[in-house]
Regions:
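Acidic, low-complexity mobile loops and tails
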Residues: 1-58, 91, 95-128
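Composition-driven detection of intrinsically disordered, low-complexity segments
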Residues: 45, 68-71
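Short, charge-rich, low-complexity interaction segments located
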Residues: 79-95
Length: 128
């Protein structure tokens, strides 16, 4: 498992081989930093399964007691699954942002887009 991060405070979990885009699916959520800045999450708007998005396109919204924020696609691709548990209990984004609080899964359209994302060390420096 490999984690990558965006400047918009989303994370991607990469399972498997990214040498080919065929069948590569990544899980996407918001970072601990993002959920901490938002405060208590009260609503999430998730994309539809089967929807196609370009990299950096808005794919969802997360609302908290403090603010609303867009969730951007860290990579282009097709939504293969959304986290229905998160829709039912948005607080999972706060209590377990890197685990049970994931937002959606995406089948990559271009694995080369992963190269522009930050690793954990880079993201830690960026968000400090």
């Amino acid at each position: 498992m490999t984690l990558k991060y965006t400047e918009d405070h989303e994370w991607l979990k990469i399972d498997g081989d990214t040498a080919t885009t065929e069948g590569v699916v990544v899980t996407v959520g918001i970072t601990h930093h993002a959920q901490d800045a938002l405060g208590d999450v009260v609503f999430v708007d998730l994309p539809e399964v089967g929807a196609l998005f370009a990299q950096k396109e808005v794919a969802g919204v997360v609302e908290s007691v403090k603010a609303a924020a867009d969730v951007y696609m860290p990579v282009g691709g097709e939504i293969t699954e959304v986290n229905e548990a998160l829709r039912a209990d948005p607080a999972l984004a706060n209590s377990d942002p890197l685990g049970a609080g994931w937002f959606f899964k995406v089948k990559l359209s271009d694995a080369s887009q992963l190269a522009a994302l930050m690793d954990e060390i880079g993201y830690t420096k960026f968000s400090a």
